[in-house]
Amino acid sequence: MTDKEMKLERFKEENKDAVKGQIVLTGSSLMEMFPVNKFLAERGSDIIVYNRAIGGYITDELMQVLDTCVFELEPRRVFINIGTNDLSDSRIPMDRIMEHYDSIISSIEQRLPKTEIYLMAYYPVNYEAAAENMKECLKIRTNEKITAANALVKQLAEKHGQHYIDINDGLKDEQGRLKAEYTIEGLHINEQGYRAIFDDFLKYLEN
């Protein structure tokens, strides 16, 4: 069983005891690694958040597991960050990424018409601060490509009457890159980086 499959099986078990009508996070590693529940606990918050993101997922994979990662929980609000792994793959064209994303949104709307959907802007990267083994990936997943993708994600949100949220300002240096001190290897974000955006994110959890 792969790491992805093991996580999915664990989520299926955890869903049996989960409280419905709460908040769900889903997507790939940048959402999986966001320690939202740790930060909420530090503030004494009673907001219930279920993180159902799985590292390594592309849009096509999330489409196949919406039952486990969204539907079974019947959330009142779902936050999605999916597509960055697609952006890192030169074989996957942008229009296909957005077609898959569109299908994900439509599926949620059909199954859970009362659920509010929040599409999160993709985070910036930092090629200069990247580990050597990440530089090839970041030649494909550039900040220019991320900016273009974010404009399309925003259009998707508008098309569906859903929400697009960009909380990236706190992550960026003067050149619009992910701040070097906030990244693990040029691409993923460390806890300090997530703290820098949590206050902005919290507004959407609370409102």
What are these regions (language model features)?
Residues 1-9, 17-20, 192-207:
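Conserved catalytic region of serine esterases and O-acyltransferases that act on ester linkages
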Residues 2-103:
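Conserved SGNH/GDSL esterase-like catalytic core that processes O-acyl groups on lipids
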Residues 50, 118, 163-165:
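General small-molecule cofactor/ligand-binding pocket signal
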Residues 81, 120-121:
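Alpha/beta-hydrolase-fold catalytic nucleophile elbow
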Residues 101-106, 150:
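Generic structural signal for well-ordered alpha-helices
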Residues 124-207:
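Catalytic His-Asp segment of secreted/periplasmic serine-dependent ester chemistry enzymes
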